[in-house]
A protein has these predicted regions:
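Glycine-rich phosphate-binding loop signature in dinucleotide/nucleotide-binding domains
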Residues: 1, 101-103, 153-157
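Acidic, Mg2+-coordinating phosphoryl-transfer loop and its flanking beta/alpha structural elements
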Residues: 161-200
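Surface-exposed amphipathic alpha-helices with a cationic face
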Residues: 92-99, 151, 169-173
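Short beta->alpha linker loops
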Residues: 46, 86-90, 111, 138, ...
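Substrate-recognition element of Asp-dependent hydrolases with the DxDx(T/V) motif
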Residues: 25, 91-120, 135
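A short, structured active-site edge motif that brings together acidic residues
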Residues: 43, 125-141
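Conserved Lys-Pro-Asp/Glu-containing loop-to-beta segment of HAD-superfamily phosphomonoesterases
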Residues: 5, 143-169
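N-terminal helical cap/lid subdomain that shapes the substrate entry/recognition surface
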Residues: 3-92, 101
């Protein structure tokens, strides 16, 4: 294998939560008198980081309702819609493939470690990971800071980040590791193609690094 360590983004890369995200944002838009997104294609084309800019793009006026209020409202909707949890296509196969080849696997997330651990348990994939690298166990802000602290501590021989967004590409660049992107998540292939190699799903991505 080309890498000894794989860092996985979670939402949109392993956890298939695109549909609940679309449902949640559309209900939020409707509640605030705004036009709903038409579906997956439009969602993937407008979604991005930071989230506050994404909210502006789709019409929210923070003079009317603050971003913090909207974010709290969205999380409540998301938690309702994101049931039952499901894996992205090819995710389980990818995790198993890497484990069989002795590659150490980690989750890199800006979410709560406890929440992600619970979700991994529910999905039945917790045993694949050496560690969840998140905001609860490393005192740094944002995924770049979290990843940098982990690299300093772990000193991986060779590492790659697999994610589904331009932000994942930026994080990998910031900490000096490679990155592969998948188009099954929150951004489409067209939006990602100028950044990195883009693969259909996690299994396609890991197959590319086994050659």
């Amino acid at each position: 294998m080309k890498y000894t360590h794989v860092l996985w983004d979670f939402n949109g890369t392993l956890l298939d939560d695109v549909e609940p995200c679309i449902k949640s944002i559309n209900e939020l838009l409707t509640r605030h008198g705004l036009e709903k997104l038409t579906g997956l294609s439009q969602y993937q084309s407008v979604f991005g980081f930071p989230i506050i800019d994404y909210y502006r793009r789709i019409g929210f006026d923070f003079d009317k309702t603050s971003y913090d209020e909207l974010a709290v409202e969205w999380v409540k909707l998301y938690n309702e819609y994101n049931r039952p949890l499901k894996l992205c296509p090819g995710a389980d196969k990818a995790l198993s493939y890497l484990k069989e080849r002795g590659v150490r696997q980690f989750i890199l997330t800006a979410s709560s470690v406890d929440m992600v651990r619970s979700q991994l348990s529910e999905l039945g994939i917790g045993g694949y990971f050496d560690e969840i690298i998140g905001v609860d166990n490393i005192h740094a802000f944002g995924k770049s800071g979290i990843a940098a602290e982990w690299i300093k501590r772990e000193k991986p021989e060779s590492a790659v980040l697999i994610g589904d967004s331009d932000h994942d590409s930026e994080v990998a660049s910031a900490v000096g590791i490679d990155c592969l992107l998948v188009s099954c998540g929150h951004m489409n292939a067209e939006k990602l193609a100028h950044l990195r190699a883009v693969f259909r799903d996690p299994f396609d991505a890991v197959k590319s690094i086994s050659e």
